[in-house]
From Swiss-Prot:
GO-annotated biological processes: metabolite repair; nicotinamide nucleotide metabolic process
Stated name of the protein: ADP-dependent (S)-NAD(P)H-hydrate dehydratase
Family membership: Belongs to the NnrD/CARKD family.
Needed cofactors: Mg(2+)
Pfam families in alphabetical order: Carb_kinase (PF01256)
Keyword field: ATP-binding, Lyase, NAD, NADP, Nucleotide-binding
Domain YjeF C-terminal: 5-278
Statement: the UniProt record of this protein carries the keyword Nucleotide-binding: yes
Domain of life: Bacteria
This enzyme's EC code(s): 4.2.1.136
Length: 290
């Protein structure tokens, strides 16, 4: 088991070059938020923008776009029902987040199939929420892209066949051998673990708690992961995912000192400040971020 420490945080979250531009920080495509789950993709997009993603485009229900833009005018948006525009956006994206607030229905399944078929090896796909449920119940072939899965315990049960009470280190390690080599798994739970298929070791969070048990927490984490994946390329993909996952719970833990429950959107709002502290290599107290 590996622990995420201050050294790793500072390796991943670095100061930006003065000569950089938005194209250096990731072209993200976020897909989801179908009725009645529109808020999920909004929270994911908020997290991605707040952690510094260069360009964020959201595909969602047309009726959800005004709500998205009222919260986040920085994001571009289009209707998921526009198949041609979806195809064009998939071709442009470097990172695709599929599934926050995606309904488990025929439309959702068609979307998952189109995304899986359309991605290339040099793209990164994060599968979350409803897309995980669809993946678990269908016999779809894995896409050629780099794959990141973010299941909670019940979703992991559906994907792996391992019941919640048997989800241990050895069973997860064994189940990962069925996924493409290099697949990153964020196994969410009371002690979240981050794995990469082909490696025997894993990261385990030492932060977080029951104050995170509220709707939208996973959507925000997925957006944070997407944002980190699109930038910080001096670190490995595995390290970027691990640090994003850690920071999500670490911020929640800090906010819980004054709040009975921590709202996902509050984590996103606090994110730029904490990232600034880390990239300036200012030491932070161990009980807050590490």
């Amino acid at each position: 088991m590996k622990v995420i420490n201050q050294t790793l945080l500072e390796k991943v979250i670095i100061e930006r070059s003065r000569s950089s531009h938005k194209g250096d920080y990731g072209r993200l495509l976020l897909l989801g938020g179908t009725y009645p789950y529109g808020g999920a993709i909004i929270m994911a997009a908020l997290a991605a923008v707040k952690n510094g993603a260069g360009l964020v485009t959201v595909g969602t229900d047309r009726e959800n776009i005004p709500a998205l833009h009222s919260h986040l005018p920085e994001a571009m948006a289009f209707a998921l029902q526009d198949k041609q525009l979806l195809k064009e956006q998939l071709e442009k994206a470097e990172v695709v987040l599929l599934g926050p607030g995606l309904g488990d229905n025929a439309f959702g399944e068609d979307l998952v199939k189109q995304v899986f078929a359309g991605l290339k090896q040099n793209q990164i796909l994060i599968v979350d929420g409803g897309a995980l449920t669809i993946l678990a119940r269908t016999s779809l072939s894995f896409p050629s892209s780099q794959l990141i899965l973010t299941p909670h315990q019940k979703e992991w049960e559906k994907l792996s066949g391992i019941t919640i009470e048997k989800q241990k280190e050895d069973t997860t390690a064994s189940a990962l051998t069925s996924f493409p080599k290099g697949t990153i798994l964020v196994e969410k739970g009371p002690a979240t673990r981050v794995w990469q298929a082909g490696q025997s070791d894993y990261y385990q969070l030492q932060v977080g708690g029951p104050y995170q048990a509220t709707g939208g927490m996973g959507d925000t984490l997925a957006g944070m992961i997407a944002g980190f994946v699109g930038q910080f390329r001096q670190a490995s993909l595995y390290e970027r995912v691990a640090v994003a996952t850690h920071l999500h719970s670490a911020i929640a833990q800090e906010l819980s000192q004054e709040n009975y429950v921590v709202l996902p959107t509050e984590i996103s709002r606090y994110l730029p400040k904490i990232m600034k502290i880390i990239c300036q290599q200012e030491r932070v107290s161990k009980d807050k971020l590490v």
